[in-house]
């Protein structure tokens, strides 16, 4: 009945012997995709006849299949319902590339049945047309089946129509010839939706077989496709469809409008048992096929329909979005198509070409000889016919020449247009570059002008301050003379009345201020005026001040000599004692060009001022005693306030400035904002909890060295150490000790080490002089500002131990210079960046004090280093940690950046990024965080390190410790020991005064996390964001925007008036997945369309729709993209169900339904998917009751974890699958807790992760850690153990939301009242795993 077995005929085909198509056929355009290659519209070069050319690469794996297809076409294409095979050609490729096979077949110009259906109104053909097409398909199949050939891929795409409405079957790429004896196949090939159940069964059961009747099932599905526009289950993922087809009942027509004959025909074709399915001969006799109108009528009707649909298709193709995307995210985005198949490949073998040419010439010569003989015979028979034939050939040659000329002109026109476009694009780029250059020059000029203006202001301010200092000095001298006269009078009176000794001006508690002496009232008035001039912030926002203890209106005892010092000149007196203490010095490494004379500044002033007052316990009457601290009754000497201080004074009996021996220093109250930690250091014998205790006094030996150096310089000798070490002033009982008056420096204490195991930290001098009078964290007046001469200084007041710093800094690697003026932004931008009510108050007075001229110590424009050292180092005693010196360094460029407060106010930051301010910055009277907020972080082994933001950072020593040298301490503030108070660990870094706190080792950078933020303030709340390349797509309540992180921080609006709740970028697939809109639909946007909205370089793309929906789902609450091997799953949480979609690659290019789980017992709020041990799929979802799982295969739902100890509903935060557990173990985060369970609900660790507070967001980050964002802090924890690795305390309570993360960058947003938001990003340590 047929030919011999196919294996024998395959041997007859030698692919290498096929001719080259060059000069015979040429490709015109792509018209479709076949099983193994692309299909082109082609043209015969000589005759101009159109043909369909299938171009495929010849690989060793596919060579047999290609031979089989050629064999099928050659043998069975000579039928009216099968596309005619014209021939095959081989286009040779350069070595290393596969050769290309060109299969040339009959061209069907009307397209496929699928195209026809899509372009028909209602996506359905008329029943007569369907019957006609089905009959023609059956005739073609009958021809194949008669020769024991199964097509195996019958579908609308493989049924083509000619211009005359003839039906042709194409694509024999999967056809197979049946074995003569068995007659059945067991290979798994075909398109899923049209595939018969018995073909699918072959994949599951190796013993299963099928025969030619599988084509009948595919015909029935194609009939449904023509009636309904798509095959059944087309919304399902292909893999899911393969699973359902054998298990579901046979599909049926949805509409009732079809005739009984058509419905019966569908039912007959779609019988699941293929042995009961009728063959093609029987179906051709079926009433639906047999009883049709005349073929001529139907073909005319179908031809008209084809013409109409072609016009519609031409219009629709302009607006339909052509999707292009790579299958893998790692693939490069190359252009689709095979350009090499259209052009001749350069460098082809000349020998091969010559050989082929000779072959063709020989063949053409023989053909020409035959034609000539035929023509001579025909000419002899009919001369007129010969003349007609010649005329016809001539006419045809003329037409070919015209066509060739037209083609050349068209090509030249295209080239001209292309050149014009390129020239325009080049000109536009040039103009853009020139505009950018002009803008940069303009900005540079503005920056230079601003710099000059600031320099002039600094100079004027310096002169003003100098004049003011001179006036104050003169006024003080007069006051001192007046005071001396009054004291002489008092002494004379006391000599007359020796039994009656009263302190100077001991005010009663109810005494009227008007009764004070005239000099005191005058100084009080002068000080109040000075405060009003220099501290505008002190009165502008009274509402922001925190609670302060009440102050009595009057206090007994004299105001004392120090009280008379004006605010700009008031020194900070040291607190000496018989034991070892710490000294902090400001060490300028390079003098400023025009410094204010130090002799008239802070350091030398107290010696002259105090010299006029006697002290009875002083061994040398000419030298004043050191400042005493409050007495046992809690009295406070107001050292930095106005002379009419109304705090309690000392006892009348002892002199005003000497502390009695039997008095103990007052205890400092514990602040609620202080962070108690316990350090576990390798050098310590054990860890001791930090306590709020008094400062450690200085040793006698160090005191003697100090006096000896003063004596060598000829300075007046200060008094010896008192018997009892003076304690720190009570900052909470005296508000002036919490206030920094303008124009002088104050120091914040740093906690010393526990029992000498760590170098004791002294006091850090304030970074800047000119700051507004706002309360500081926990001021403790320290000996760091005592005036000490030095041989190495360039002006008075230089510390004596400057050599220590020199030795320290010689070992350090040089830092790269940073340009101070590279970063410019207006003061308005700086003020609006963090806190309007706090930053917008730094008026001209404060700004001018920030300038170099406003610094009373003249220590500007120099490498300013804050050194905290141990006094015992001078005597050669080495502390346990090597040198024991902690250095906080700034380069000259950084110092200049700090001084230019009208710039960003921050160092090392471009315009794009503006970091948040320091924890204590501009916090006028701000109350500290509540006890419950900070108490949670006080016992977790943390050390606070300053950060460049409104977040105060606490870091575990073991997590972010850089591996530096052994003689430097990893972070610059240490905790523990007696003699300190816990809340002294506060760096008072004011606006624009950011101190680089990197350890002084040779590492290029610090691995301590830092937080910065973008200046752009979004008007509506930021709900989500995703990184697209380096840039950030930001979704808000009102639209989608792109934040350009690579340029100047510009924000591009992409989509407006649409709410974006969640988003993810899949760059390899050219997709942005979102939950967006009022109805919370799952929409997919094409990245190329979004890109064009920014660049506007492709006008064709603008006409196309740039997004589509996934399914018809509304009310999506959450989704998750899960990548497993090469499959991308999309799990979606709806109101009462969970949908699972999967990405379908070519030719579908979309997410398609995979599984649906409806009627769940709990509403899913959070959803995820895991693949257990690489085999079992499970959906994990969180609800208000707990966490649950659904087995994907069986659909069974069960509870994983229900927190029974919580009676009310819970808020699930995150489902985190632990690494290296094969998807079996996870951390479930809810409320302020987290538990470790496996996918079967068994607790795997007796650890309950406990957050310090209720987080608003929880996220797993790349460093194998989890982060929790709360209103008071950001916590970083280990995902394996829940151990707290670090904390960032907020300056104020605020609502934060995690956005996205990549590598060592974590992005989150803050939401303020009124809905405005800003984007922050945190840079983690660089050792995090790069697994993006």
UniProtKB/Swiss-Prot annotation:
InterPro entries: CNH_dom, Kinase-like_dom_sf, Prot_kinase_dom, Protein_kinase_ATP_BS, Ser/Thr_kinase_AS, STE20_Ser-Thr_kinase. Residues 396-466, 518-528, 736-748, 804-821 have a biased composition (Basic and acidic residues). The modification Omega-N-methylarginine is found at residues 501, 509. Residues 598-608, 670-682, 915-929 have a biased composition (Polar residues). Residues 866-1332 are annotated as: Mediates interaction with RAP2A. The modification Phosphoserine is found at residues 324, 326, 641, 701, 754, 763, 777-778, 782. Pfam families: CNH (PF00780), Pkinase (PF00069). Interacts with TANC1. Interacts with RAP2A. Isoform 4 interacts with NCK1. This is Misshapen-like kinase 1. It comes from Homo sapiens.
